Every structure is written in C-alpha cells, then in structure tokens.
Swiss-Prot record:
Binding site for Ca(2+): N58, D61, N63, S72, C168, E169
UniProt name for this protein: Fucolectin-3
Keyword Metal-binding: yes
Lineage: Eukaryota, Metazoa, Chordata, Craniata, Vertebrata
Residues noted as binding alpha-L-fucose in the record, renumbered to the chain: H75, R101, R108
Keyword match Secreted: yes
Compartments, as annotated in UniProt: Secreted, Extracellular space
Disulfide bonds: C73-C168, C104-C105, C130-C146
Protein purpose: Acts as a defensive agent. Recognizes blood group fucosylated oligosaccharides including A, B, H and Lewis B-type antigens. Does not recognize Lewis A antigen and has low affinity for monovalent haptens.
Region (F5/8 type C-like), start-end ranges: 31-179
Superkingdom to which the source organism belongs: Eukaryota
Length: 180
C-alpha cells in the first residue's frame, strides 16, 4: 500500500510540472487514452432517421472520423445536453482531447464545459471544470489541458444552452510511468 502511495505521489509531482499549454510528456512517462476502457452515456440520443449513428459510445471508439454519417460520432437531443464517460476507476487526468463534428454544425460545441470528478450528482455537471470549449472549427481535434492534474472517474462534456451536443471522439489523457 505504501509503495502504491509513493508511486502516486511521484506521478502527481511529475504531472504537476507540466504547463497547461504544454504537449510535452515528462521523461519516464507515457500518455494513454483511458477513455477507450470506459463506458459512455449521454443525456438523450438523437431520434429519427439518423439515430443509429448517434450512440454515446461512438465518441470513445478510437476513431477520429469527423463525418457524423460514417458512424463514429455521438449526437444528443434536447437542451442542456451532456455526454459522459465512466472510466471505471479513478485516474489523475492531465488533459482531454476532443474531435468536433466536421460535416456540419461545428459551431454547436462552443461553450461546452469539460468536467472531471468522482461524483455523478446532477449527471456529473457539479464536478470541477477542466476547461471550456470556447471555439472549435468543424472537424478540428483539439487538446484541452486542465490547469492542474485532476483526479476523477467521470469525464463529462456539458453544453449549457439550447443546442444538441455532437462529439466525434473524446480522449482522456493520463500519464503512466514508462515501463523499464
């Protein structure tokens, strides 16, 4: 138990040396997308002719294809939409990478909040904020660095306006010690 605690403290120390605008990975560490291991859900799935393409799990399939009709994007329906991944365990998260829809409606994501925490109260919307998506071009993939490493099991993307939320990939980035 003490060894695990010491390793965790070293991880936090190494991660905290990252600047929020840095894409560098500290020596001796590897970055991994842990969202691929998770389970996704969303506030409400799009209904109608193209509903089959709209599943929450499409945003964690490892495919950054930004064309909604290719079946690799999620799509909510209704106001104040949210999408969430349960990572199934707690991690120290440094950043979240999002791929925006590219074939249409890229502006809809503006104002979305990326929230990370250990609680599901209010569907994770009450968890601390990592970053806000101010603007993203259609089809763009962008990494949002948390101001400091954040500990959490749930990553929620919440769009607090009257608009649907469309995500073509969500990657939750965690640093692990590199194998020797």
């Amino acid at each position: 138990m003490e060894v695990k605690m010491i390793i965790l403290l070293f991880q936090i120390l190494a991660i905290s040396t990252l600047k929020s605008d840095s894409a560098d990975i500290p020596e001796g560490y590897i970055q991994e997308n842990v969202a691929l291991r998770g389970r996704a859900t969303q506030s409400a799935q799009l209904k109608g002719e193209f509903a089959g393409f709209a599943h929450a799990s499409n945003a964690i399939d490892g495919n950054r294809d930004s064309n909604y009709h290719h079946g690799s994007c999620s799509h909510t329906e209704g106001d104040n939409s949210w999408w969430r991944v349960d990572l199934k365990q707690v991690y120290t998260i440094t950043s979240v990478t999002i791929t925006n829809r590219g074939d249409c409606c890229g502006e809809r994501i503006s104002g979305a909040r990326i929230l990370i925490g250990k609680h599901l109260e209010n569907n994770g919307i009450n968890n601390p904020e990592c970053s806000t998506i101010n603007i993203m071009a259609a089809g763009e993939t962008k990494t949002f660095h948390c101001p400091q490493p954040m500990i959490g099991r749930y990553v929620t993307v919440y769009l607090p306006k009257a608009e649907s939320l469309q995500l073509c990939e969500v990657e939750v980035n965690v640093l692990f010690p590199a194998p020797c």
